[in-house]
Amino acid sequence: MDQAAQDNRIRSVVIVGGGTAGWMAAASLQRHFQGSPLKITLIESSEIGTIGVGEATIPTIRNFYQNLGLSDLDVMRATGATCKLGIRFNDWLKPGSSFLHPFGLFGQDLRGVPFHHYWLRLKALGDESEIGEYSLGASLAKGGKFTQPSRNPPSSLSVFDWALHLDASLFAKLMRQVAENAGVKRIDARITRVNLRPEDGFIASVDLDTGATVEGELFIDCSGFRGLLIE
């Protein structure tokens, strides 16, 4: 890397807001740039409470926390999570209607033709089977059952995936623990002013209610609906 490229590298990131978004961003960035000179600071106020709601995730959440060095059991124990095989949509087609969108495949492609074409053909011929009946994940969910998918691609048990339903506040707490253990700095304060660079309007620093000013090269707004930086 030449000197010009090195001089253009971002060396300080300031994340405004904690919660799941803020601490996930902090933990992920710290992990990705581990060993680099990048300094990550997260600013949040303990005076602003969080709501411990249930968080409905999709399977990619498991890739996310596994990249942080956490196992499924680590996260489930820390957040009281339960296994999730899909998402149910109520009243989408019409009032009283419902369908389950499972994580995984429907049926089996045949002769290079995607399975849903065969299902639509059956529908046209009068078959009343719902497409969910051809999904292992949907069938497991309907029966209140769960098993780990097979890691062997040819296996019929490899065609579905799963995620977690967890407590958002507990997951944020876990992400904070991971981030701080990796070196992220936390500042407990409220932001009173956002200072912009006159030459281009980019954020230069933020003033805190403690009287301190925090400078940064990249600012990430995770303050939710308040939009402290983006509004």
Give a label for each model feature:
Residues M1-I10:
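A short, basic/flexible loop-to-alpha-helix module at the beginning of a structural domain
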Residues R11-L38:
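N-terminal Rossmann-like FAD-binding beta1-loop-alpha1 element of flavoenzymes
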Residues V16, I43, A189:
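The conserved SAM/SAH-binding core of class I Rossmann-like methyltransferase domains
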Residues Q30-V53:
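Glycine-rich FAD pyrophosphate-binding loop
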Residues G52-A141:
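Dinucleotide-binding Rossmann-like beta1-alpha1 core, especially the glycine-rich loop
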Residues E128-S169:
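Alpha-helix-centered segments that form part of catalytic cores
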Residues P153-E231:
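Predominantly flavin-linked oxidoreductase catalytic cores and closely associated redox partners
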